[in-house]
Amino acid sequence: MAEIVLNVEVRERTGTGGARDTRRSGMVPGVLYGGDKDPVAIAVRANEFRKALYTGKLLGHLVTLKYGNETQPVIAKAVDMHPVTDEPQHFDLYRVDEHQQIKIEVPVHFTNQDDSPGLKRGGTLNVALHTLTVSCPADSIPEEIVFDLTGLEIGATIRVADLKLPAKAEAAVDGETVVASVAGAMAEVAEEAAEGAEGEAAAEGGEE
């Protein structure tokens, strides 16, 4: 079930001017789209929208939209913020069925950096994917995907296939896609390269 309920009003005026008037009236303009229905211009009271946004349970989550006595499950797809005031300026909601299979981006987080021998030796975790696109029911969107770095050495590569996804969720990208890697410090890389060159030289000398 959705944790957040947004009480919306339908906007009569659309476009830049309509959105500006909506914000001046203390509301945040938005658009409801998706499904087999036409897009609808909507608005939510600014204080209610900010409260929902700052819970961290709005963007990318299943939300209940309420208009009068009617309700509609939606996914909050995007929120535009003002570059100076950091106030919400506009939002997009996507109509869904609670059990509908959807594709959505989920944040990827890494734990136990201190238990990675490679990182403890000065290595760097190079993250290629900060989010992963998954396919899952709308009412089972994962909060996050967590990868345990325990035991990883320098040179280790983490791929999508290595991630443990929650029940009902499947990766929507190739399993060989690189998520992150543990790279060595430059000095260590240079030292290993030098050792490799010395080993090759010694081997060639032995063959003569």
Curated annotation (Swiss-Prot):
GO terms for cellular component: cytosolic large ribosomal subunit. One of its GO terms (biological process) is translation. Transmembrane segments: none annotated. One of its GO terms (molecular function) is 5S rRNA binding. Coiled coil: none annotated. It comes from the Bacteria. Keywords: Ribonucleoprotein, Ribosomal protein, RNA-binding, rRNA-binding. Belongs to the bacterial ribosomal protein bL25 family. CTC subfamily. This is one of the proteins that binds to the 5S RNA in the ribosome where it forms part of the central protuberance. Part of the 50S ribosomal subunit; part of the 5S rRNA/L5/L18/L25 subcomplex. Contacts the 5S rRNA. Binds to the 5S rRNA independently of L5 and L18. This is Large ribosomal subunit protein bL25. It comes from Phenylobacterium zucineum (strain HLK1).
